[in-house]
Amino acid sequence: MKIALIHYRGGLMDGVSLEMEKWKKVLTKMGHEVHIVAENKKEGVDLTLKEIGFENPDFERVNRNFFGGIKDFLSEKEFLDFLKEKEEELFHILNEALKDYDLIVPNNIWSLGLFPSLGLALSRLEKNFVAHHHDFWWERKHLIPENRRFREILDKHFPPDLPNVKHVVINTIAQRELKRRRNIDSVVVPNVMDFSSPITSEEMYHRVREELQIAPGTIVALQATRIDRRKTIELSIDVVSLLKETLTSKKEADLYNGERYSGEVILLFSGICEDEEYLKELKEYASSKGVSLLVLSEEVRKNTSLFWKLYNAADFVTYPSILEGWGNQLLEAIAAKKPVVLFEYEVFKSDIKPAGLKYVSLGDRCFRENGLVKVDERILKKAVEEISRLLFDPSLYRETVEHNFEVGKRHFSLERLEDILSREVLP
């Protein structure tokens, strides 16, 4: 088959872009011709349609008025007429651009509804679809319109219940909710990772650290998520701050890799920044807690291959998000053979934890204090004690990362994706 994977954007480091690339790799291996279709001209995007993405002024205009209240139109009717006009334009563009494809795989276009005209136009194509839903509009408060008519559009069409559409979700919570809300059946396809070989090596560990001018014996915690408030990165700062304080007596002791601990702990940000104000707050908070930050977000934005390279520099990975649809950076850490400190968000507990990973827990409850997310001090202290043991025990460190790598290979690999696609998804 000739297959189009379509999204607002592609070739970036967000979860949807990454999963599309994995689907493309697996589907191509299965013998299909696969193209990624998006608005932006990035490496990895095979067909560019400038009308479907964030940079299209109509996208921004529709999104602002649909979700934030009518501001740019005289009446609801005028705005709905504009929506219909854009739908017609997009229908003709899509009908022509996608005419030669046998299967269309929209990613989040029908589940978030960020550009309703696009979703409505897409549903009119006489094609076979596999709708890949990573997130749903009802999971995001800012995507639930106050306007009754607009809410009805989302309730009825996002996602559409059509005989030519098969639905895929990424976790069992979303599967149950889609069934409850719309009586739509779906297949759970977890996020996956290439576990054919580790993405790090001892040689690269030393080389990357040398390039970054990180002194030998420095402990590096890696925060690889995008910089966004939903990732609650302040918890990583709390972890690193307490870890450094706890390890005062360990200076010159042998780390898991044979190096002598220098007394320094660094928190490295490798994810692209999507909230400059939040990054500023994190820098101020880190300074107040005595935590050294190394922020390489801009460098990664310019060169995405650097993102993967930076896993080599880490001694452990922090993953403190309180809300995730799945957990790409968790799988990346496992593939990189790095221990993980994580907050037990709902999807982790329902879909990932049963696989049997070994991890350092920040619990599953949090609270806000002065605008920042916090966990109980006793849980934080226990987590730091566990990290300390890992970092200074070569056998425990090796056993933990090797165990997790095997779990990842068994449950969350490209081979697992191929199996689900062939048995449960493809027509």
Curated annotation (Swiss-Prot):
The name this protein carries in UniProt is Mannosylglucosylglycerate synthase
Q: Family per UniProt?
A: Belongs to the glycosyltransferase group 1 family.
Q: What is its EC number?
A: 2.4.1.-
Indicate yes or no for the key word Oxidoreductase. no
Pfam families cross-referenced by the UniProt entry: Glycos_transf_1
The record's annotation in InterPro entries points to: Glyco_trans_1, manno_glu_gly_synth
Q: What class of enzyme is it?
A: transferase
What is the relationship between temperature and activity?
Optimum temperature is 60 degrees Celsius.
Biophysicochemical property: pH dependence: Optimum pH is 7.0.
Q: Which cofactor does it need?
A: Co(2+); Mg(2+); Mn(2+); Ni(2+)
Q: Which organism is it from?
A: Thermotoga maritima (strain ATCC 43589 / DSM 3109 / JCM 10099 / NBRC 100826 / MSB8)
